[in-house]
Amino acid sequence: MATPDGAGPHPAVLILRGVVGPDDGYTEIARRLAEWGYVALLHGWKVRGANPPDAPVYDDLKGALTFLRSVSLADQRRLAVFGFCRGGVHALMAARAHEEIRVIVVFHGFAFRSAHSQPGAQPYDLAEGVNAPMLVMHGTEDEQAPVADMRRMETRMRELGKVCEFRFYDGARHGFAVRTHPGYDEHPAKQSFDEAKRFLETHLRRLD
């Protein structure tokens, strides 16, 4: 966990990683959030296997939410989730079940089931039950979640009248925002974190 200076309470962000991690790349992201003025908690899977089903991972992250609620520095009224890679799906699952999650930010996330032969709802099905504002940032060359699927999800979200923003980065691959990921790309990484900071300031920090 990384915490900002000052007595608080501060808005808080739960960071949900993908299959790779947690590692120094995610630790750097937590520290960056603390520099912005947010309590940042990095969730690491405790379930067995490198690529476990979503349900036990979600059950485990509920414990992380419970812990974050116990942190005196964290403002329980201002809670966001950052989902990276498969953590984007877990962010949707968490926001559907926990109304206290006020903002969702997703980096190169939402692996669609047709690509991975995994059972369960598609990301756009999960998103139908989410009311929190959502920012989604994706690379056009993502090999894990094809950009065509993401554009269909954008269309579906707008049809549902959701508060959402989508940003697409030309040439960026899966993992572009995490420094230790093979797909890391400095320029779209900087752009995406600038967007994330703006989105948090607009939809989370200003909440009463």
Model-based region annotation:
Residues 1-9:
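Short beta-strand-to-loop junctions in surface cap/lid or active-site-entrance loops
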Residues 9-18:
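Short beta-strand element of the alpha/beta-hydrolase
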Residues 19-30:
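The serine-hydrolase catalytic nucleophile loop
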Residues 25, 51-72:
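Alpha/beta-hydrolase active-site loop
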Residues 33-50:
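Conserved alpha/beta-hydrolase
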Residues 63-129:
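Primarily recognizes the serine-hydrolase "nucleophile elbow" in alpha/beta-hydrolase
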Residues 130, 136-138, 142:
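Short beta-strand/loop motif that positions the catalytic acidic residue
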Residues 158, 163-208:
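C-terminal catalytic histidine-bearing segment of alpha/beta-hydrolase fold enzymes
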